[in-house]
């Protein structure tokens, strides 16, 4: 997060306008401009744990991570700079939350890549902070308005759910596969053996569907789930509770907050971070797994078939197996042996 995103580069064209402002940065914060822009005061709120990690190192307590922002998170701010995400329901959740807390008269800036659908911000905020486009560059749009009316925000209204083979999956905006089980996860689930025992870690757990499906036919497993996304953490907790499954769920940047070793690590790792394609998380997952697997333990992941994971698996574990595949996806399995690098 050292190079600025195109959206931040557009904002920097207007940096003089922000020098006297007390700014709250929120949304898809993929760089450290909130810590570096010259302002009267800066705060940041994010639902992404890895973004918070970077910003908190430079901003301390002025960078906050949570599902729902509170009045304390926006205190004394007179300007909102919101980075539009690729997911419109996610933007609506975050903006309605923030605008319900900020005082009438707050300056509102919305910036984002055109391909992310940022222009729909105009319609979304029409009743609260009518926006006008004030700049267009780097295939991004920058919109400005002033908060005229606070929306009423109720986080409970954003919950959704769907069923998978009799299990109820709870979801929130911004959670992967919010509207149904994705094909990759289906393929990974098909490979999980009933009556498995031991400690299982689900990395990038999303809504928790892999874990609850696994626990249904292997009730003796002890589950730990983690994700970088605050909505995913809350959705997984709700999914586990709804289905009567026990497990520990917490925010973590891959293994950053994970303690101990496990008998199995399962994952459908992301390769998109916001609008940017990124393989970093999956490579960190593979290389770091050896520090969190017991001897004889296994890493089992599903990935798009075109992604270059076999080389990283072989480099780390000494070998790998493909135990299921379709035209688009492969399920990889690697075992912790003495050949594996100890990280």
UniProtKB/Swiss-Prot annotation:
GO molecular function: 16S rRNA (guanine(1207)-N(2))-methyltransferase activity; nucleic acid binding
Subcellular location: Cytoplasm
Major enzyme class: transferase
Gene3D superfamilies xrefs: Vaccinia Virus protein VP39
Naturally occurring in which organism (per UniProt): Escherichia coli O81 (strain ED1a)
Protein name: Ribosomal RNA small subunit methyltransferase C
InterPro entries linked to this entry: DNA_methylase_N6_adenine_CS, Mtase_sm_N, rRNA_ssu_MeTfrase_C, RsmC/RlmG, SAM-dependent_MTases_sf, Small_mtfrase_dom
UniProt-listed Enzyme Commission number(s): 2.1.1.172
Catalytic activity reported: guanosine(1207) in 16S rRNA + S-adenosyl-L-methionine = N(2)-methylguanosine(1207) in 16S rRNA + S-adenosyl-L-homocysteine + H(+)
One GO cellular component, as annotated: cytoplasm
């Amino acid at each position: 997060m050292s190079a600025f995103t195109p959206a931040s580069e557009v904002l920097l064209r207007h940096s003089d306008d922000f020098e006297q402002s007390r700014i709250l940065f929120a949304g898809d914060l993929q760089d450290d401009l909130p810590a570096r822009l010259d302002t009267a005061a800066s705060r940041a709120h994010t639902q992404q744990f890895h973004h918070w990690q970077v910003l908190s190192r430079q901003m301390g307590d002025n960078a906050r991570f949570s599902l729902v922002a509170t009045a304390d998170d926006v205190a004394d701010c007179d300007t909102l700079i919101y980075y539009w995400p690729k997911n419109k329901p996610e933007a609506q959740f975050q903006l309605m939350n923030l605008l319900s807390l900020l005082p009438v008269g707050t300056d509102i800036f919305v910036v984002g890549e055109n391909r992310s659908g940022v222009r729909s911000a105009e319609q979304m905020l029409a009743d609260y902070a009518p926006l006008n486009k004030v700049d267009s560059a780097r295939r991004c749009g920058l919109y400005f308005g002033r908060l005229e009316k606070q929306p009423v925000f109720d986080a409970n209204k954003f919950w959704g759910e769907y069923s998978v083979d009799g299990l109820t999956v709870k979801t929130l905006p911004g959670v992967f596969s919010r509207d149904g089980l994705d094909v990759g996860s289906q393929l990974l689930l098909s490979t999980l053996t009933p009556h498995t025992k031991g400690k299982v870690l689900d990395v990038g757990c999303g809504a928790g569907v892999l874990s609850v499906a696994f626990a249904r036919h292997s009730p003796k497993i002890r589950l730990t789930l983690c994700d970088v996304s605050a909505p995913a953490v809350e959705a997984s907790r709700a999914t586990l509770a709804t289905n009567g499954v026990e497990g520990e769920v917490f925010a973590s940047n891959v293994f950053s907050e994970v303690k101990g070793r496990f008998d199995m690590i399962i994952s459908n790792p992301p390769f998109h971070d916001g609008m940017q394609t990124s393989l970093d998380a999956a490579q960190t997952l593979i290389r770091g797994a050896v520090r969190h697997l017991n001897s004889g333990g296994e890493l089992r992941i599903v990935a798009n078939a075109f992604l270059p994971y076999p080389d990283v698996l072989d480099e780390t574990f000494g070998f790998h197996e493909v135990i299921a595949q379709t035209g688009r996806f492969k399920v990889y399995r690697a075992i912790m042996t003495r050949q594996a690098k100890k990280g």
